[in-house]
Amino acid sequence: MTFEAKYLGSNGWLIKFDKTNLIIDPWLTGDLIFPPGEWFFKGSLDNEILIEEDINIILLTQGLPDHCHVPSLKKFKKNIDIICPNSAKGILEKLGFTSIKVLKPKEKIMQKDLEIEATAGAPVPQIENGYIVKDDKGKGFYIEPH
């Protein structure tokens, strides 16, 4: 079984299985600014992060900017499969994404060759998502960024 995990900084991960590559909470380009503005929080990347692998799934744990980073999401094809909590859905729809699957804690979905189960995540203020991800051989990982 191939399983590689590459930390991308902030909350981001690139996960490679035998047949499927997924990216979690990508911040790949541009500044990270939390509302109400730069005076509250602004993070900057030293360099843009380039992803050479074909990404099959985007997995978002929250709808907040450090998990659902709009400038980074704009780099992906609009028909890529995205799994997310409800807090990210409206942002993704405004960006034109067409394959959005919203999961609530305890819900599962089969996506490509992966089983993805949402778990209760951080309450910021509503409950966001963690995930248990397993391949077709039952190997996998758990993520909740807090």
Where are each of the predicted segments found?
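Short active-site oxyanion
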Residues: 2-4, 76-82, 139-141
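Catalytic core of the metallo-beta-lactamase
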Residues: 8-18, 110-146
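Short, polar loop motifs at secondary-structure junctions
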Residues: 9-10, 85-91, 104-107
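A short helix->loop->beta-strand "cap" motif at the edges of active sites that frequently abuts
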Residues: 20, 78-81, 97
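Pre-active-site segment of Zn-dependent metallo-hydrolases
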Residues: 20-59, 71-75
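Active-site neighborhood of phospho(di)ester-bond hydrolases with catalytic His/Asp-centered motifs
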Residues: 24-25, 54-68, 83-86, 141-146
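Active-site environment of divalent metal-dependent phosphoester hydrolases
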Residues: 31, 63-68, 89-91, 107-110, ...
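Helix-loop-beta element that forms the nucleotide-linked donor phosphate-binding surface
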Residues: 92-102
